[in-house]
């Protein structure tokens, strides 16, 4: 039995920290032989600020554009992980609350490690909003590798 995970869930969001997390996941995969699952979580329409101010058509258009951008970023991240020597198994585009969806997907996949970037929220914003990476660390069933800039 190996102490290294066979599956790594890389949670990405398009930020610079997420790109650094992708590098870390690639290196971990390369060194352990683990496969990498790359995930991006789009907020559901209910979670978007001001969603009730726009028509359904406008919201649908915004969400379609966001989904297209997320798919493009997911594919770029997967290619980058592969170019860096990581073994990419699959990409996952989910919708919902990012922290909850990351934890759910990690359990569903049987991931041994989650790799996620830290957005570096200041103390006040973190106290008011909480952070996705912080919530994932608290609720995940497996170790979480948080990458800082």
Set out the residue ranges of the language-model regions.
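Structural beta-alpha unit
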Residues: 1-4, 76-114
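Glycine-rich, Arg-bearing micro-motifs that act as flexible, cationic patches
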Residues: 113-135
């Amino acid at each position: 039995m190996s102490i290294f995970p066979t599956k790594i869930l890389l949670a990405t969001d398009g930020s610079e920290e997420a790109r650094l997390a992708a590098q870390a996941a690639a290196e971990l995969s390369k060194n352990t032989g683990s496969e990498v699952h790359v995930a991006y979580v789009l907020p559901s329409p209910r979670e978007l600020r001001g969603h009730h101010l726009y028509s359904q058509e406008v919201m649908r258009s915004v969400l379609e554009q966001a989904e297209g951008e997320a798919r493009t970023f997911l594919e770029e991240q997967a290619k980058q992980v592969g170019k860096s020597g990581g073994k990419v198994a699959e990409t996952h585009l989910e919708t919902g609350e990012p922290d909850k969806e990351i934890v759910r997907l990690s359990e569903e996949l049987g991931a041994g490690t989650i790799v996620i970037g830290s957005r570096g929220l200041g103390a006040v914003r973190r106290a008011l909003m909480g952070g996705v990476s912080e919530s994932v660390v608290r609720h995940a069933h497996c170790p979480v590798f948080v990458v800082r800039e």
